[in-house]
Amino acid sequence: MDKERINEICGFVDKGIRDKVKLLLENGVETYESCEGGKGHAYFEPTVRFHGERAEGFRALSVAMTHRLEVRELKRVWVINDGEPTGAWWEMVFIPTK
């Protein structure tokens, strides 16, 4: 993904997680949802969701750790819709910086 597209996407991202999303995108992680977390937000903690096969979460974690981002959790997520598992996708949860 080129820098112009990354900057365009990041213009819609919560300020408190924008740098993390930008870093992941610049390193080829296909993010699709993020939230800086906290009161009044969709998540309690800063969270980024991204697409990828089994190994992608570990690759994204390596990117985050290499750049000294404070990751609290890495999850592979399936939700149950109408009794059937749907997914999977990845979630990376960061330690809040407040």
Listing of model-derived features with the role each one plays in the protein:
Residues M1-K98:
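Structured alpha/beta or helical-core interaction and ligand-binding surfaces enriched in interleaved
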